[in-house]
């Protein structure tokens, strides 16, 4: 027994002397909802500038995934959910390295089922629950764990707030109703994913507390408040309408009272519509031509010369009547009644 202990102790002391690097410690795969993270811890070693390389087995050969990283974890979420994998990691320093540390892993069996999301609606003496399964890493938003596991269900646990007695119910649907609860009582609820065929459970969600109502009667103080508010709103509305109409009436009355009234003759004219029609037709149409009279004035001397033809031969030719012949467009002077002049009038259009 003593030789074995001495050999083991000698080998342990020779490790730092020969420069051998110890492997990573506490290597494990931490997978939640198919987010696969390989984690480890830095080994006890005098030098602190160690790096690490992590690999996974693909088609019977290992592929580097995280090479010479100073981190103590490596993300393997890209792996298929239905395969069996061997992943490994080692510590490195310059050209030296430690032994590999292997971990076997099957995502669909080993991943941890995270807590679902839950919404609660209080209705009378019951609580209506709605669930959402956890989403899958590196998949579209519509993909959840329910799309991966055919036997997916929800396990609901609820209890009255302040008590230790808990009740459970399992539902394969995305909703559940907790009935026959005590009215006006606060209940706390939490939910977890559950695989019926594997009897495998996930993590519990955080408790959510909600108060129930009462379907039979509504509290009298609520009815009183609603009634008072309704009456007050109607009263204010009617009062506002009355004030607006009163202001309009006062403004209209003041306007007509202070304004000047129409003249009496204009009121009489407007009171007989046929006067307006007569006034309209009293003006000539715009296309009608103007009418004027041409007046000719003939003196007695001119008339006498016409009666003595012999005198006309000896006399000089008659002179231009000049200004004694006038044309007037609108009006012409009329001769006096005692003037023996002959007036002739012709109309031209």
From Swiss-Prot:
Q: Which organism is it from?
A: Mus musculus
One biological-process term from Gene Ontology?
Answer: defense response to virus
Q: Does Disulfide bond count among this protein's keywords?
A: yes
* UniProt xrefs under InterPro entries: FN3_dom, FN3_sf, Ig-like_fold, Interferon/interleukin_rcp_dom, Type-II_Cytokine-TF_Rcpt
Query: Which cysteine pairs are covalently linked by disulfides here?
Result: 66-74, 188-209
User: Mind telling me which PROSITE patterns this protein's record contains?
Assistant: FN3
Q: What is this protein called?
A: Interleukin-10 receptor subunit beta
CDD domains, alphabetically? FN3 (cd00063)
Top-level taxon: Eukaryota
Q: Where is the signal peptide?
A: 1-19
Q: Which residues are glycosylated?
A: 49, 102, 161, 199
